[in-house]
UniProtKB/Swiss-Prot annotation:
GO cellular component: cytoplasm
Species of the source: Coprothermobacter proteolyticus (strain ATCC 35245 / DSM 5265 / OCM 4 / BT)
CDD domains: cpn10
Pfam families tied to this protein: Cpn10 (PF00166)
Full protein name: Co-chaperonin GroES
Gene from which this protein is expressed: groES
One example of a Gene Ontology biological process annotation: chaperone cofactor-dependent protein refolding
PROSITE patterns in the record: CHAPERONINS_CPN10
Example GO molecular function: protein-folding chaperone binding
Subunit structure: Heptamer of 7 subunits arranged in a ring. Interacts with the chaperonin GroEL.
Primary location group: cytoplasm
Membership in a protein family: Belongs to the GroES chaperonin family.
Amino acid sequence: MEIKPLGDRVLLKPMEEEEKTKSGIVIPDTAKEKPQKGKVLAVGTGRTLDNGTRVPLEVQVGDIVVFSKYAGTEVKVDGEEYLIVSERDILAVVGHEN
């Protein structure tokens, strides 16, 4: 199933953090924080201004982004977990993957 975000929404695949600390201690699932980094899989058509002009989104498919801790809506499709967030909840682009 294809997910196409609408307007200024962005579809992300959350990236899990390391399972171990640098010193080798394994972090149990109960102590893990919610991911705040993800890969952009799809973007909406952009934000519409009051005068009807459409402003394209700044992020692109393939960008690795950092987003607000409690941002977006989690969705599960075909056993995979995704996050749909508004572009304003994305704090920074930290890389790009193809």
